[in-house]
Amino acid sequence: MLSLRQRVMRRGLLCGSILCGGAHARPSSAAAAGSADGRRLPPMVPPELDDAQQRLYNTIVDTRIKVISKDALFDEHGGLRGPWNPEVASPALGQHLERLATAVRTENSLEARLYEVAILVVGVHWQAQFEWYAHEKIARKAGVADAAFPLMKVGAPAERLEGVLRPDEVAVYKLALELMETKRVSAATYAETKRALGDDDRKMADLCMTMGCYSAVSKMLNMFEIALPQGEPLPFPDRG
């Protein structure tokens, strides 16, 4: 039986064949520029990748398929959705951003429910469609209360999340919101959040690095206008 990666590569090879307009054909220059299919980057599919790109593609597939659905990970060409297509386009830098994002998930001193709250605050600030689309699902699985998502999506004040989120989640939300909105964190908010996290300096550092990582991801999603899977509603429809 073929592995998931082999099935994806076979799909990419088929798309690069005569059935899709010529062996290993990239999209036209108009498509690559975004005028034909809305893309600002062409899909990075296995038949067209150099060795470094292929290694990163394989790493992303192997790690991310454990976390998100195939529809969220792969596009119709066999390329990668989300921030992963730009990462594969420039693997020398992309591999390091991917390692950081993986470390946020696997080596974070914060519980997943806490760092996912912070990631969602970042996504709302940047109005990053794919960020919210992907991480709302992950946050729900991590145990964030269903009633919190409509409030977080509109950037509600932290006070409105009290009694909806757990106290430590409210503290993380408050600090994240304050940092994104004012570019600073007050002494009172910092002290309150640190207490809520058990006076743990490592957790405070990990919280900041998590937000920094996903600020970079959100900006990449917005710059390249990364689309959601077909038929998925936009989390921020007014942004387009």
Question: Where do the PLM segments sit?
Answer:
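N-terminal secretory signal peptides
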Residues: 1-7
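N-terminal export leaders
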Residues: 9-14
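Acidic, carboxylate-rich catalytic segments that either coordinate divalent cations
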Residues: 193-195, 204, 216, 220-240
